[in-house]
């Protein structure tokens, strides 16, 4: 029997995909959000899902719906406040997700870094082999009736993943992030320990992460990595090229054969190894895993590429030093003979304060670095540090860019321009691409 759902904050990177899933299942779905365009709304519009502007009257007009409340909203948000006032049925986003994943064999992917890419890769492989629903943090979701698998990205921010109880979990790493909420690495590790204790069947964890190794869940734990002395699933005979990476996989002494992925950087190999591991333990055919790893084309805003004349533009969500290192490493592998230019928009003042030295160190891997002004958040509009302060710590710092002035970036030819950030870095990228396209057209 179909139901009606109303999403408060439907453009959220998790809310949007969940709305798509419920719509795909034949439910009536609508929701509200800000008017500003976001990349997550395109699939909602394509599905014909109605998007309203936040207004308390929306709650009154849809009292017959189940309201799904986005994680970003407090009780004083205009629609949340009205929903609480009149007593309609309202559930949190994690509660709504858990309701969905409880109906099938569920695999949650969690980690400070790499969870979206790994979720996307796992969803791609499984959906081509068996009926699979998935919810990815790039704004992509798909609901398949009578799914065999449900793949979900599990976010550690504010312990949102504590409500999930999946059959399996992939844990890519534990790192100190979100300093506006977590007090330190011990606090983050505690959150992951609580999540791991909810997993029913097995956990697949990166073996080089000592924080992950410190977890003691009741479920079986399989470690993946490149260390045959410590890991259960091991990638060996690794070869990296400008076309991607290929490697052999060994599970506790058993040779599972060679695999190849069109991915770049060491993190791409580890993500693929995690996908191979969980799929193998669910007895998915190895040849099918091999086949569909090769056809993976990535997820939104994770090393997304486009070519404009002689310039390669890469768009990536990297907003933590570890992620910046991984993204620039991938760019070096794929384009070893080109200049790598980093254009980075720091995300939140608290994160820049906490990681100023680490940001500077990670960005040094580029040939030249440009910064946009710090992007604040709804909870953090100002701070005591600036992008210029960060730039002063970077030896290859080229200056601060503005949306209406791309002159610093225009002299580069036959280069790789890597735009990174979790805020609105895309507006700088679009401004650059527009001007670059005009200039290159004028020269032809």
From Swiss-Prot:
Localization per record: Cytoplasm
Domain of life of the native organism: Bacteria
GO BP term, example: cell wall organization
InterPro entries: Mur-like_cat_sf, Mur_ligase_C, Mur_ligase_C_dom_sf, Mur_ligase_cen, Mur_ligase_N, MurCDEF_pg_biosynth, UDP-N-AcMur_Ala_ligase_MurC
Metabolic or biological pathway, per its Swiss-Prot or TrEMBL entry: Cell wall biogenesis; peptidoglycan biosynthesis
Record: residues binding ATP: 111-117
Pfam families (UniProt xref): Mur_ligase, Mur_ligase_C, Mur_ligase_M
Enzyme class, spelled out: ligase
Keywords: ATP-binding, Cell cycle, Cell division, Cell shape, Cell wall biogenesis/degradation, Cytoplasm, Ligase, Nucleotide-binding, Peptidoglycan synthesis
Residue ranges that the Swiss-Prot or TrEMBL entry lists as coiled coil: none
A molecular function (GO) term: UDP-N-acetylmuramate-L-alanine ligase activity
Similarity annotation: Belongs to the MurCDEF family.
Function: Cell wall formation.
Protein name: UDP-N-acetylmuramate--L-alanine ligase
Protein source organism: Leuconostoc mesenteroides subsp. mesenteroides (strain ATCC 8293 / DSM 20343 / BCRC 11652 / CCM 1803 / JCM 6124 / NCDO 523 / NBRC 100496 / NCIMB 8023 / NCTC 12954 / NRRL B-1118 / 37Y)
Gene symbol of the encoding locus: murC
